[in-house]
Amino acid sequence: MTRDIVIIGGGVIGLAIAVELKLRGAEVTVICRDFQAAAAHAAAGMLAPDAEQITDGAMKSLCWRSRSLYSEWTSKLEDLTGLNTGYWPCGILAPIYEGQESKGVRVQEGEGESPAYWLEKAAIHQYQPGLGEDVVGGWWYPEDAQVNNQALARVLWAAAESLGVELKDGITVEGLLQQQGQVVGVQTNTGIIRAEHYVLATGAWANELLPLPVTPRKGQMLRLRVPESVPELPLKRVLFGKNIYIVPRRERSIIVGATSEDVGFTPHNTPAGIQTLLQGAIRLYPQLQDYPIQEFWWGFRPATPDELPILGTSHCPNLTLATGHYRNGILLAPITAALIADLIVEQKSDPLLSHFHYSRSQKQASTIPMLTHSANFSNGHTKNPPLPTLDSPLIIAGKSFHSRLMTGTGKYRSIEEMQQSVVASGCEIVTVAVRRVQTKTPGHEGLAEALDWSKIWMLPNTAGCQTAEEAIRVARLGREMAKLLGQEDNNFVKLEVIPDPKYLLPDPIGTLQAAEQLVKEGFAVLPYINADPMLAKHLEDVGCATVMPLASPIGSGQGLKTTANIQIIIENAKIPVVVDAGIGAPSEASQAMELGADALLINSAIALAQNPAAMAQAMNLATVAGRLAYLAGRMPMKTYASASSPVTGTIS
């Protein structure tokens, strides 16, 4: 587990991540240039994925998930601090003007969908008295809500402080120190700050530190005060109009916002901006023209070209990105904190993160590499064109991999076949039996020279070990073997404890004992296990980097015989799940990935094929296809037929 973490940015996103990481046991430092300048102070606090009419499917899902967390999340923060966040599930009313949108009844189907109700003119004016005469109807979004954004920022700061997060306000970050693909420190105006892991959450200023497509979008806002002559708060819900929103607060203030101006970091309110806000607000709710103005302010939202956030891994394995939230930073704070903490602490990447990876803006990153080198196959198979991807890298023990297929080196008829197959598989991790290399077992001679270990990550395994003590000893040898091949920082080990010579089933007790010791010694342990959900959980709890449940006995080629248990493991694991052993055909590889497995390890099915290199490529394609299918989401199964072609509106 990564414990020492520096978060660059002290806005709502950075503080939310800091609190979540601290609650999970990490030591966290937050570096903040100016807490009062954070975009959170210039927001209105709407939690409005429905009213915003977000059309991107992944973004909508992210927003809905975050909104569903809000009640429990704010309660937790309030319990930690004794302060009020102003969370108010008041719903949002979206009035419309003539010609703005056609009327009708919105029908939303499917689990997780939010309801929306159309109100005719008479109904909406009765429901919310005082609306402008131009309002001809509107939508009611009962699940949207609001939070007092400024109160939330203060509560998050107080929560972080109370938990022991080190808060460094007034510190300017001048750059990220990088060496050999890692961030090794943060250069600030007061010196260098170092950690094991770093999180970039600097909002609109992200581009100052990394070449990310994040630009400032200025927003002007104002606050009105409900006069004392008005006995009750006239608005009990947010009004969301065309290019304007009106947000009532229970302490009798009303927020009006917001402009959206592409003017860089140009400061200050402008007469034109304030006039636009007042005109829009008064047209929507005319009595505001008589309310006193308390204050004006402005802020800078972090915008991206597609208006989606940038979340997840970066070009450095110890740098995580959480920026570009644009209009939805307040809304997305709880889900961002949870997903980023999962990624850093548990090395578990939620499939949703793949949609928000920084590489989506780079043309060259819009494909999955199928083959890393050219390969000549005897049957004429050639390198396939790359496929489009929604995916983010596989992360194991903080190290990123693009391929989700791992392979081995055993059972091949020749070194040449093994070399061709490794290349054809596109894999980045190859497991090697330490004992067989040490004893120069036939087929394992010359492995050090056979593969390019500068491009392939070695996964030493303890195959042949029958006890925990033996496996621990061989794991130590494996680490030294990796160092001899130039992988000085390789602490990976595939743990196998197999006393059963007939069925080659792993010993759960010995595996757990060995795993506990190896984790204490600093190994990233990848244990091979029966598909036992309870054992998988115990191994996760002791600190293993992955779990590797078998699909069926080693080398049997029986395919997926443990599907139900593997599904349970996948649903409950917070570390990567790698299905290992027994897969015999590409269709089975694809099926395992469709279940939600994070990766596969396949050796026998490739090595024992009539054309190993071609089978390696097929397994690569199947792994990619299964992963894409899992991310895309399977259509629901039905007990009845549903015509693919329309039965009405056809041309006769």
UniProtKB/Swiss-Prot annotation:
GO biological process, one term: thiamine diphosphate biosynthetic process
Keyword set, alphabetical order: Cytoplasm, FAD, Flavoprotein, Multifunctional enzyme, Oxidoreductase, Schiff base, Thiamine biosynthesis, Transferase
Stated role: Catalyzes the FAD-dependent oxidative deamination of glycine. Is essential for thiamine biosynthesis since the oxidation of glycine catalyzed by ThiO generates the glycine imine intermediate (dehydroglycine) required for the biosynthesis of the thiazole ring of thiamine pyrophosphate.
Name of the protein described by the UniProt record: Bifunctional protein ThiO/ThiG
Reactions the enzyme catalyzes: glycine + O2 + H2O = glyoxylate + H2O2 + NH4(+); [ThiS sulfur-carrier protein]-C-terminal-Gly-aminoethanethioate + 2-iminoacetate + 1-deoxy-D-xylulose 5-phosphate = [ThiS sulfur-carrier protein]-C-terminal Gly-Gly + 2-[(2R,5Z)-2-carboxy-4-methylthiazol-5(2H)-ylidene]ethyl phosphate + 2 H2O + H(+)
Enzyme Commission number(s): 1.4.3.19, 2.8.1.10
Requisite cofactors: FAD
Main location: cytoplasm
InterPro entries documented for this protein: Aldolase_TIM, FAD-dep_OxRdtase, FAD/NAD-bd_sf, Gly_oxidase_ThiO, Thiazole_synthase_ThiG, ThiG
Region span, ThiO: 1-366
UniProt subunit comment: Interacts with ThiH and ThiS.
Record-listed glycine binding positions: 52, 301, 327
SUPFAM superfamilies assigned to the protein according to its UniProt record, in alphabetical order: FAD-linked reductases, C-terminal domain (SSF54373), FAD/NAD(P)-binding domain (SSF51905), ThiG-like (SSF110399)
UniProt-annotated location(s): Cytoplasm
Gene3D superfamilies xrefs: Aldolase class I (3.20.20.70), D-Amino Acid Oxidase, subunit A, domain 2 (3.30.9.10), FAD/NAD(P)-binding domain (3.50.50.60)
Entry-linked Pfam families: DAO, ThiG
Gene designation: thiO/thiG
Transmembrane region(s): none
Binding site for 1-deoxy-D-xylulose 5-phosphate: 555, 581-582, 603-604
One GO term describing the cellular component: cytoplasm
Pathway: Cofactor biosynthesis; thiamine diphosphate biosynthesis
Single GO MF descriptor: thiazole synthase activity
Upper taxonomic lineage: Bacteria, Bacillati, Cyanobacteriota, Cyanophyceae, Nostocales
Chain sites annotated for binding FAD: 5-19, 44-46, 173, 325-331
Region annotated ThiG, chain positions: 393-652
Native species: Nostoc sp. (strain PCC 7120 / SAG 25.82 / UTEX 2576)
Residues at the active site: 494
Family affiliation: In the N-terminal section; belongs to the DAO family. ThiO subfamily.
